[in-house]
Structures are given as C-alpha cells and as structure tokens.
Amino acid sequence: MYDRVRTSLFISPLLILAFISEIFLFLFLLSICILITYETNLNAKKYTRIYTYLLIIFTYFLLLSLNYNVLIYAVYISLLSFTVSIFFNILGLRKNKENLNFTNQISLDGKDVVNLFFLRETSTIYYLSGVLSIFFIYQSPSEINWVLLPLLTVFAIDSFSYIIGSRFGQRKLKLLEIISPNKTLIGYITAFLTGFIVFYILNYFFFNIFSPSTSLVISIAFPICAVFGDLYSSGIKRNFGLKDYGNILPGHGGVLDRLDSVIITLVLIGLAKVFLS
C-alpha cells in the first residue's frame, strides 16, 4: 500500500508537467511508449522488435510535427487492434487453461506459438496507439478536461475497488478466476458504482464536456471498459505466464499494469469525441 502511495506521489508531478509543457508531454508519452515496447516483449529478448516499434513511433511523431492529420487514426487503430487481440487472448486462454496454475508456477507447456505471436503484436499496437490517441483528445490546453475526466475517474475506480475489495471481498467470480484470481465480486461492483458516480459528477459539476444524457451513457460504459481493460491485460499475462508486465513502478508492477484501465478509457473518450465532433 505504501509503495503504491509513493509511486503515485512520484508520478503526479510528472503528469502536471506534461500538461503544462507540450515538449514535456511529448517526452513523457515517448518515454511511456518506449517502456511499453520493452514490457510487451513479455520476457523474450527480441530487441529487433523494439527497434521496429520505436521507428514506427518516431515516424508518427514526425508526421505530427509536419502537421499531417494523423491524430484520429490512433483512435481507430487502437480500437481495431484491441478487437483483434481479444480473439487471440481468449483463444489462448481456452486452449491452455489446463496449464494455468496460480498456486505454484504458471506453466507455458503446450502454448500455441503462432497465437502468442499475434496476441503480443496486436496488443502492443493497441497499447501504443491507445497512448498516442491522447494527442487527438488533447490538442490544446483548453481541452485538458478531456484528459482529466478519464484519468481522475480511473484513479477513483482503482483506489476504491482495491480498498473495498481487499477489505470486504470474499466471494470470487469463478468465470473470471482463471484470468484474475484475486479479484472479488464486491471489488467489481465497487468499480462499476465508483466509475458511474465519479464520471457523472465530475462531468456535471466540474468539466461539463458532455450533455447530461450523453454523460449518463458514457458513465455506464466507462467503468465497464475500465474493468474489461484490466481483465484484458490480465488475460495476456496469463497467456505468457507472467504476474506483472514489469517492476518499474513499486506497488503496481510495470507501466502497463498501471495503464491497463487508462488506455481503454482514453480510446472510449476518443471515440466519444469523434462522434461529437
């Protein structure tokens, strides 16, 4: 718990600087993308793969600097790659569920190499494009609310579901136990209620981005997406026999362990902005 607090206190000033300075935002997101390409290697030493993705990322930033209209494509690519990767994620879990052992060591015997390859690459594209979609959501300082709303809501969801779930959660969902064995029913309920209430209140009283009717719809979809994003990442880690994506953030694990719910909700907000534009 204390590690989580210390990590949050360290990250908060970086986020503030990122939204004060465009250059720092660029460097901050570039650093996150580099860490994502490393973490999605998933224990494999594939440095050529990292260099390839870094080249793609730098090309995207170059196009942005040359004023090419590529902002919106990050949202579409993230949605498409996310949808495709779900198929490989579920396929891997179904085919190898007998090899998943959470009490001792997770076995990788009998894994489908082709399926794991496509799962790793499609999920990496989703993560990277999801992070880069922030450039579409946040194009000027006046649009800071578009970023603060999902970030604050996800923070509330993670905090309350973790506290309530760890203190009062006993009953687990057998359907999801193979993916996330430590999550409880009360934790999921808390996540949904927290996301619904916090999103609607923040939008209505502070940010005023969406109309009340639109906010109601997104308030329902938001916590569902946040929880699904967490389960999605957990499924990938189970497929590769990992507990965490990394250990760079004490108390959280890797960068993706902290951003799993954030990225999918950024895509949701990006889609909402597309349809409302």
What is each of the regions a protein language model found here?
Residues 34-45, 154-172, 224-265:
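Acidic (Asp/Glu-rich) catalytic motifs at the cytosolic membrane interface
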Residues 1-220:
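Membrane-embedded alpha-helical bundles of polytopic integral membrane proteins
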